[in-house]
Amino acid sequence: MDVNPTLLFLKVPAQNAISTTFPYTGDPPYSHGTGTGYTMDTVNRTHQYSEKGKWTTNTETGAPQLNPIDGPLPEDNEPSGYAQTDCVLEAMAFLEESHSGIFENSCLETMEIVQQTRVDKLTQGRQTYDWTLNRNQPAATALANTIEIFRSNGLTANESGRLIDFLKDVMESMDKEEMEITTHFQRKRRVRDNMTKKMVTQRTIGKKKQRLNKKSYLIRALTLNTMTKDAERGKLKRRAIATPGMQIRGFVYFVETLARSICEKLEQSGLPVGGNEKKAKLANVVRKMMTNSQDTELSFTITGDNTKWNENQNPRVFLAMITYITRNQPEWFRNVLSIAPIMFSNKMARLGKGYMFESKSMKLRTQIPAEMLANIDLKYFNESTRKKIEKIRPLLIDGTASLSPGMMMGMFNMLSTVLGVSILNLGQKRYTKTTYWWDGLQSSDDFALIVNAPNHEGIQAGVDRFYRTCKLVGINMSKKKSYINRTGTFEFTSFFYRYGFVANFSMELPSFGVSGINESADMSIGVTVIKNNMINNDLGPATAQMALQLFIKDYRYTYRCHRGDTQIQTRRSFELKKLWEQTRSKAGLLVSDGGPNLYNIRNLHIPEVCLKWELMDEDYQGRLCNPLNPFVSHKEIESVNNAVVMP
């Protein structure tokens, strides 16, 4: 049965087809080369947004730092990071007033978690900047290296202790006059290969002890390594993301725990929930605004976009928020939570690998490491790069750039959401003291704003007031990229709302298909994807049945496991036919062994082996599920979780 794709759209309303215009099929773009240029862009942009702030020099590291907080009030619509501390604190106070006890309760929850969390929490996560080797490593390795070096420097760290004790070590390490580390270096030498008699380069990795003085150690502890964000669709330019080292991670974790606890209690927060729960939250806010506006009011919704959210955020604002939120709490707790923002106020951005140069005439390639950018002759660079380097030079120390303002991507998602929600919270009539009022949703830098007013002038006034209020705390709503519609049609975090949520099906398109690496995983992923889309994305029964047939077809072609009684010849068909003929109960064979497909849209939740178990020949059962079978690995069962299975 072959499918004509145009038939799928005959009865689809236009708004449901919007999702197919998303750039989601095909491979996403990946970045190549170094991220140095993108990182310099980020550093330069961040300083430009805060350029009217005050410059100071960090006494410990000698890094020049720009502080835009309580800077000039904006006179134009350009994005800026001049948050006013008193406005932030007032927004926090109003948030607490309208949610009684919220900060108090979240602090108590967090305090409990702080005392129980083990240090191995930090092994979760991907690539982490390993300050001992000055490059990225998997999180577990970076943590182990850090603990090992702390130990050899007389600190008490251990891998199974509490996270809070590890953080005490981090604090102590920053007071030390010097830290001795073991670092790796590469030796290259040219040797003649005995076999081929050609010259080859041999690399050996050696270990050496190195002493870091206080300044060098502090710079490393405060460094965020940067990389280019991969696989971003729908963008022409790549951008830089940051990964912090182990010294910062633990402190950030506790701050985010507190902020998460607060977000869970805020109806306007799109974090930390996701999926259908997030849609339900959203629908509630929309319902509330629509119900109130039915008789006399107009209701409009802005699908919002903020300009460079994290480059205009400021760690000092977060410090003020935390100081306020924890104001009645024990001293030790306040200290632990305030360290993360303080470290971010003094952070350094590592510029990455540097630039690659090649000479066409001499066929030579050479890399200029970031450390050399401070004093290399700029005549080798093209004009745009030259401008970047000139701008960033005053900020450079040892190949890292001092970056006090701004937050870098994805660091304080929860806490910045709390800040956003605190402005949405000010839209209640008792605060606006006029005819317009607003509400909305915030999820990290994404927001949807619903404004109600008796007439269009009121709506405009409400939007203007929201815009200006945001400016006061360093949030810059982009007038160019936000658009306004009658409430009932908007987009928030890639959920499209039109009198209810429209399934954004194209987001799922890449997961339909067979990867061709692992037969059993592909089978279970394939049917699960179809099941999930029936639950979440309006995939109807007829289309799902068709998707299932196409999937089985695709699967059989990928693994060449056509039914044993088929006429199709492949290089597996001889073996599969033999198995087919030897098997008494042919229905019991797995699809990957040339068996028939027993899946339909009613039994997608059952793994294939379970589905066919009763139908299998005994010796076939023994082969599939035999602990002594050398081709099937079996772990000792450590614990049993009873799955909650919905009928």
Curated annotation (Swiss-Prot):
Top-level EC class: transferase
Motif Nuclear localization signal: positions: 187-195, 203-216
Keywords: Eukaryotic host gene expression shutoff by virus, Eukaryotic host transcription shutoff by virus, Host cytoplasm, Host gene expression shutoff by virus, Host nucleus, Host-virus interaction, Inhibition of host RNA polymerase II by virus, Nucleotide-binding, Nucleotidyltransferase, Phosphoprotein, RNA-directed RNA polymerase, Transferase, Viral RNA replication, Viral transcription
Disordered, as annotated region: 50-82
Compartments in which it is found: Host nucleus; Host cytoplasm
SS bonds (residue pairs): none
Entry GO MF terms: nucleotide binding; RNA binding; RNA-directed RNA polymerase activity
RdRp catalytic domain sequence ranges: 286-483
PROSITE patterns the record matches: RDRP_SSRNA_NEG_SEG
Residue ranges crossing the lipid bilayer per the database entry: none
Reaction equation(s) it catalyzes: RNA(n) + a ribonucleoside 5'-triphosphate = RNA(n+1) + diphosphate
GO biological process: symbiont-mediated suppression of host gene expression; symbiont-mediated suppression of host mRNA transcription via inhibition of RNA polymerase II activity; viral RNA genome replication; viral transcription
Role according to the record: RNA-dependent RNA polymerase which is responsible for replication and transcription of virus RNA segments. The transcription of viral mRNAs occurs by a unique mechanism called cap-snatching. 5' methylated caps of cellular mRNAs are cleaved after 10-13 nucleotides by PA. In turn, these short capped RNAs are used as primers by PB1 for transcription of viral mRNAs. During virus replication, PB1 initiates RNA synthesis and copy vRNA into complementary RNA (cRNA) which in turn serves as a template for the production of more vRNAs.
Oligomeric form and interacting partners: Influenza RNA polymerase is composed of three subunits: PB1, PB2 and PA. Interacts (via N-terminus) with PA (via C-terminus). Interacts (via C-terminus) with PB2 (via N-terminus); this interaction is essential for transcription initiation.
Family classification: Belongs to the influenza viruses polymerase PB1 family.
Name the record gives this protein: RNA-directed RNA polymerase catalytic subunit
Organism this protein belongs to: Influenza A virus (strain A/Chicken/Hong Kong/YU562/2001 H5N1 genotype B)
